[in-house]
């Protein structure tokens, strides 16, 4: 005999739902967003298809053009462990001293009809002591306030390891301007200091650079600091020589 409190099998029924008709709400939203992203990506790729016929250099330093090197100075600096030393400071007397140690390549004097497309500051670092095993570190800043006075020594905080050939290379080109620069020969011949101030720093950034090592001891480093000018190479309008062989 059943009462109102007794359990009746017919009162409660069990239903089995087929999962193929139900999907996770998160999966539905993610799938919709994924399809939308793929459609937008295809549209963007179609707009960039005309650029496939152009080639660009992954590293601008290795791109088209000729590199003209001007070595500014070679010096030996001592760097203590866990610190980085200021080696390039254009805002002070660093490059306005009377004793210039410039070493020019024979090909440097840039003629008037050549265009300068970019300028790189290149710092080559070499250990002076034999059988030393450490790596070089470097840090730089480009957009400094003209009145900013950098510290001579700083602690190592998130530095960059110097790559192959122990060479640290910085592009000094300003975004949206500064290139090309022409007619450098007369300025350079008249006064090198005026050439640096009026031509280079009017069109390119003034960097400050710190270098260091990951060594646990004080190290002696030979630094070679140079400016490398990327010169645009173009074919002349007329052949240089005329004769039977041409």
Swiss-Prot record:
UniProt keywords, alphabetically: Viral occlusion body
InterPro entries the UniProt entry points to: Polyhedrin
GO MF, one annotated term: structural molecule activity
Disulphides: none
Pfam families assigned: Polyhedrin (PF00738)
Coiled-coil regions, chain positions: none
Organism domain of life: Viruses
GO CC annotations, alphabetized: viral occlusion body
Record bears the keyword Cytoplasm: no
Family stated for the protein in its record: Belongs to the polyhedrin family.
Function: Major component of the virus occlusion bodies, which are large proteinaceous structures (polyhedra), that protect the virus from the outside environment for extended periods until they are ingested by insect larvae.
Name of the protein in its database record: Polyhedrin
Source organism (scientific name): Buzura suppressaria nuclear polyhedrosis virus
Gene name of this polypeptide: PH
């Amino acid at each position: 005999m059943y009462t109102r409190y007794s359990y009746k099998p017919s009162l409660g029924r069990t239903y089995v739902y087929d999962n193929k008709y139900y999907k996770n709400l998160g999966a539905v939203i993610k799938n919709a967003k994924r399809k939308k992203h793929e459609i937008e990506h295809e549209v963007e790729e179609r707009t960039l298809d005309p650029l496939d016929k152009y080639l660009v250099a992954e590293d601008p330093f290795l791109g088209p053009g000729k590199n003209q090197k001007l070595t500014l100075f070679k010096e030996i600096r001592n760097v203590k462990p866990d610190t980085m030393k200021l080696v390039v400071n254009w805002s002070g007397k660093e490059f306005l001293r009377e004793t210039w140690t410039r070493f020019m390549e024979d090909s440097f004097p840039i003629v008037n009809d050549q265009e300068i497309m970019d300028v790189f500051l290149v710092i080559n670092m070499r250990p002076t002591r034999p059988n030393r095993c450490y790596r070089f570190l470097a840090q730089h800043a480009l957009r400094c306030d003209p009145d900013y006075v950098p510290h001579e020594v700083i602690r190592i905080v998130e530095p960059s390891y110097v790559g192959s050939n122990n060479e640290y290379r910085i592009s000094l080109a300003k975004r949206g301007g500064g290139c090309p620069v022409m007619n450098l020969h007369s300025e350079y011949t008249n006064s090198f200091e005026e050439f640096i101030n009026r031509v280079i720093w009017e069109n390119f950034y003034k960097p400050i650079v710190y270098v260091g090592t990951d060594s646990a001891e004080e190290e002696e480093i030979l630094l070679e600091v140079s400016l490398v000018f990327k010169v645009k190479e173009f074919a002349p309008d007329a052949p240089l020589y005329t004769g039977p062989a041409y």
